[in-house]
């Protein structure tokens, strides 16, 4: 149960994402973190694949852009479409500077703090005295990490986009693993409900 809680607490809401989008007057470095952060929320990739994105992986689409990723963990190629005007504009000019995983994780928390994402939230933090993760109540921005981006992507699209399509993008091979990842349990009617939405006869 503790592991499931850890998954659930790190998600960002749509309202919180809009607050991040609306941030201004950030330093150049912090705004670069914000851009990578918002891109991660729109493409659902692991941080190692996200931060290795290069201009040659970007292609024009009829209604946005295609991003071609090679997922290192699964050894699979995947193309993700993006159409958010802000993200498309940044990608078209490739307004992203290289950044390390460690610096990115620190920057995410700072961006979230600037956006006022500070609701006291149950989660895990490293206790420096014991060197173990400790469950407690913390301002939500302290709990945001690069893992939060992919999980938020999956959670916000779940129930709106067919689950196999989300799994293809995030790189999950088993539905049970995917559902655990976003803190859901398998609903025996989910497949039937999804099918009914697509029926046209």
Regions found by a protein language model. Name each.
Residues 1-47:
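Basic, Lys/Arg- and aromatic-enriched nucleic-acid-binding interface segment
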Residues 6-7, 72-131:
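C-terminal catalytic core of Y-nucleophile DNA break-rejoin enzymes
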Residues 8-11, 78-85, 168, 180-201:
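DNA/chromatin major-groove-contacting recognition/catalytic segments
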Residues 16, 43, 52-89:
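Conserved tyrosine-mediated DNA breakage-rejoining catalytic core shared by Y-recombinases
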Residues 25-27, 109-168:
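Short, basic (Lys/Arg/His-rich) helix/loop patches that form interaction surfaces
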Residues 36, 48-53, 166:
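Alpha-helix N-cap/helix-start motif at helix boundaries, enriched for small hydrophobics
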Residues 40-42, 157-158, 182:
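Short amphipathic helical patch at the helix-1/turn junction of helix-turn-helix
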Residues 57-62, 159-181:
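Short, polar N-cap/turn motifs at the start of nucleic acid-interacting alpha helices
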């Amino acid at each position: 149960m503790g592991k499931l809680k850890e998954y659930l607490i790190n998600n960002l809401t749509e309202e919180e994402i809009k607050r991040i989008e609306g941030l201004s007057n950030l330093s150049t470095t912090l705004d670069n973190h914000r851009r990578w952060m918002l891109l991660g929320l729109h493409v659902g990739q692991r941080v190692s694949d996200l931060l290795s994105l290069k201009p040659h992986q970007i292609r024009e689409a009829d209604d946005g852009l295609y991003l071609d990723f090679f997922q290192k963990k699964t050894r699979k190629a995947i193309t993700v479409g993006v159409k958010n005007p802000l993200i498309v504009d940044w990608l078209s000019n490739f307004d992203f500077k290289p950044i390390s995983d460690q610096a990115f994780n620190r920057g995410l928390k700072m961006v979230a703090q600037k956006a006022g994402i500070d609701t006291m939230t149950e989660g895990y933090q490293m206790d420096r005295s014991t060197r173990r993760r400790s469950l407690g109540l913390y301002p939500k921005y302290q709990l945001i990490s690069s893992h939060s981006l992919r999980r938020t992507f999956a959670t916000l699209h779940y129930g709106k986009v067919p689950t196999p399509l989300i799994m293809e993008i995030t790189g999950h091979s088993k539905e049970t693993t995917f559902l655990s990842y976003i803190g859901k349990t398998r609903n025996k009617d989910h497949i039937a409900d999804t099918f009914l939405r697509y029926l046209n006869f």
